[in-house]
Amino acid sequence: MMRKIINKELFLNIGKFIFLVLVLGAFFFDYNYKSNFEKETRRTEEKNAKSVFENTDILARGAIVVRLSDDFVLYEKNSDKPMELASITKLFNDFVFVSNLPLSMDIKVSEADTRMYGAGVISPGENFKALDLLQMSLIVSSNDATSALARSYGETIGRNIVLDMNSFASNNQLESIYFNTPTGLPTDGGFPGGVGSPRDIAKMLKIINETYPDVFFLSSYERIPFFGPDEVVLNTNKALDK
């Protein structure tokens, strides 16, 4: 009788062990299958993406296309060569502003804000929320709106915003990036407003996307009401028209 009980318990234990092995085996098989499938899918996507760029004539002097999920480079051209950033500089000015000050703050436009090339969208003495000026900076590439944000930053924080823009670039190992102006316009001495390589710009954009993605959301509007419900400003990015 005792032997039958022992044999029965042994049989049950063996059965449990076999069941556990089967469950674990199925789990690892499923995991490996999914892992291999995902790897193969990713390789196919990479191959297809690269073929698109290989058959496309990129006219820009420098460019880079990076998959943000794993930093895989799909395409690059002179990606480590520093170049003038022009209005890309505004994006970083705006990012530093929203990282330190509320968009609800009131800003009065000064005479100096409108005394530059590309000004004329806003006028001295007008009052705006920081959010309004941010939208003008991002959507219309307004130099006067960007200047008003930068000036207000300096008056409120007590530091020139360009210093903080450069500090952020340095702290994040964006070695090729350097700013001289908040708008990207050249200095009075003729130096570029900002310089940086496509690779470091891609890194900078990833940081902005992870920290304050609304910056990109705001710049995606084709048009926005600004001076009133019947008056709108149009995005300078013509790709949004398509």
For each of these PLM feature ranges, what is it?
Residues 99-112, 212-220:
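Short, well-structured active-site flanking segments
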Residues 13-28:
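Hydrophobic membrane-insertion alpha-helices, especially the h-region
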